[in-house]
């Protein structure tokens, strides 16, 4: 929620832009805070509402994609959409999005550090993303945006 609010604030890179939220039906609960944190006029909620081919067509129309290591992240990258891939401790150099229009943000904590924490729950992969900071993702997003914008005008 904080990342989207930062990036869509007045004067920021996605100010006045709409945000599309993609995911499967079983991801609705985890996505609701993000959806509820955006004004209805700025949110396109596609959680569980579209087939993979429809989602692919929607992603193709996006001007930017930020998401975890997933099939949708790879679809965005393959379509040429500027893509920020979010990674826990898995190796982004192996599984990250490819291309000049892509960048990965990786957890600052190793896999062994993350699984050794008291609150680690092996039934949830959410714990593996806790080492990602909003600041790091915002910085990477702004850098990629500036790089893409610069290459388009130059």
Regions found by a protein language model. Name each.
Residues 79-107:
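Gly/Pro- and small hydrophobic-enriched strand-loop and loop-to-helix capping segments
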Residues 44-47, 70-71, 90-93, 108-112, ...:
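Glycine-rich loops and low-complexity Gly/Arg-rich segments
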Residues 28-29, 52, 92-93, 104, ...:
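Flexible, glycine-rich phosphate/dinucleotide-binding loops
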Residues 42, 87-90, 97, 120-124:
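Short, functionally important structural connectors and interaction interfaces within domains
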Residues 54-56, 94-95, 113-117:
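Short, charged, surface-exposed secondary-structure boundary motifs
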Residues 1-88:
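Donor-binding and catalytic core of enzymes assembling or modifying cell-surface/extracellular glycoconjugates
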Residues 100-154:
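Leloir-type glycosyltransferase catalytic cores
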């Amino acid at each position: 929620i904080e990342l989207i609010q930062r990036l869509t604030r007045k004067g920021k890179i996605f100010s006045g832009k709409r945000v599309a939220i993609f995911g499967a039906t079983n991801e609705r609960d985890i996505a609701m805070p993000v959806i509820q944190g955006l004004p209805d006029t700025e949110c396109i909620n596609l959680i569980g509402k579209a087939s993979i081919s429809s989602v692919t067509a929607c992603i193709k129309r996006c001007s930017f994609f930020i998401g975890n290591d997933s099939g949708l992240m790879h679809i965005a990258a393959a379509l040429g959409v500027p893509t920020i891939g979010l990674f826990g401790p898995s190796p982004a150099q192996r599984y990250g999005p490819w291309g000049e229009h892509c960048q990965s943000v990786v957890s600052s904590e190793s896999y062994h550090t993350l699984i050794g924490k008291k609150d680690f729950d092996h039934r949830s992969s959410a714990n593996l993303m806790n080492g990602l900071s909003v600041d790091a993702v915002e910085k990477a997003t702004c850098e990629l945006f500036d790089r893409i914008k610069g290459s388009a005008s130059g």
